[in-house]
Amino acid sequence: MALGETKGIILFTKDFKEKDKLVKIFTESYGKLMFFVKGAHRKNNPLLPAILPFTEAVYIGNFREEGLSFLNSSKEVQPFRNIQQDIFINAYGTYILNLVDAAIEDQHYDPNLFQFTHMALSALNEQKDPEIITNIFEIQLLERFGVRPEWHHCVACGETQGKFDYSSKYSGVLCEKHWHLDEQRYHADPRAIHFIRLFSQVSYEKVQNIQVKEETKKSIRETIDMLYDEYVGLHLKSKKFIDQMKTWENTLKIPPRKKEEK
């Protein structure tokens, strides 16, 4: 790698010595890279706005295959302002970026995942439902962890309509007529499976049209947690924070209105 430029999204930053920072950026052209930013704590550093958490920009610098890369300048800086300023949205955004960091190796070229991440953060920044946005991201990201469940139809007969449950034995969904084939299936709420099947293929442009009751969201969360525990094995601090946040969320904000599912 050499001098060049690429779009990128800040994954995280951490202090390095007294005045400098290490900044991990998910770049569109080179994958994930760790950058050294000298003098990052100086208030007059022109790079400062471009290396804040939840920022997307075009980054110009020395991109290296080994060791640290170096940032020279930036342009077209676009902060995800609502994510930066809202603790609740910030929590979901942090979790999404942590998932990205865990899902692919550094320097792995994945422009599709870059675009998907951009769309997820944009939807969060537009204050669309953060739980639904995150659930969609989790389900569609499973493939990056080598997990490819069959969500579209019953793995036994090809049925696409009706009630379904997830079977680890068959790596996909079973329709109600074939639940007897796996006594160890998830026994998940059929409504949760319905939405997870939808999330496996829906685009973020249609998120605003998805309405889910709070009790169903809870079932979806439990089912996705089962999938990640079984297949991925991640235990991210940002996910734990979201789980804890749900217990005190209603004391800090107005409870959401009841919604009709569709």
From Swiss-Prot:
Transmembrane segments: none annotated. The keyword tRNA processing does not apply. Pfam families: RecO_C, RecO_N. Involved in DNA repair and RecF pathway recombination. Keywords: DNA damage, DNA recombination, DNA repair. NCBIfam families: reco (TIGR00613). It comes from the Bacteria. Belongs to the RecO family. One of its GO terms (biological process) is DNA recombination. This is DNA repair protein RecO. The gene is recO. It comes from Enterococcus faecalis (strain ATCC 700802 / V583). One of its GO terms (cellular component) is bacterial nucleoid.
